[in-house]
Amino acid sequence: DHIGSVRDTLPGRDGYALSGITLVGSLIHFDKLVDRGWPDYDFPSREKVLAADKGFIEHYFRFIEHQRSLGMVAEKFENGSRKQFAMKYDPKPYARDFEIRNLASNGEMWTGKGMKTRKMYSGDINLFDENMNSCAIRLRYGKFSYYNGGDLSGGNLDMPSYPSKERDFESQIAGVCG
């Protein structure tokens, strides 16, 4: 769920170190990169974003800019969208059966109606950690459905480090995910 680590980098030749996504992106061309923070990276604040991956985030930003110069498109993850991750080849025969729905990111989730979203927590900074930023999607193909929510909080709410049910994002998302 992390973009890379400054401790585990290989030297790169395009102005950024290679680790995590920058390493994979140097080996496999991405047509599109979808990121929860693009282009501002200001949730919950720019300072918190820069501190979260200290030493590596700058390499990630340079990677994005370099890849964009080669034709990659960068987009912000759109909560509620079912078009951001569309089938590229021959989509018509699968239009009714295939969908990737963006469910949540940045502590905000799709309501299940149109493109409407709502906050999943009150904004209490004491409850916040980077896991609450995770992007969640549901892939549906016919009767098959798959959910991925990265590191979204949920589960054992009796732990002292998680004193609030407000941190249980997964249960909230389950209602619209199905």
Feature locations, PLM:
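Flexible, acidic/histidine-containing loops and adjacent segments that form or flank the divalent-metal
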Residues: 3-168
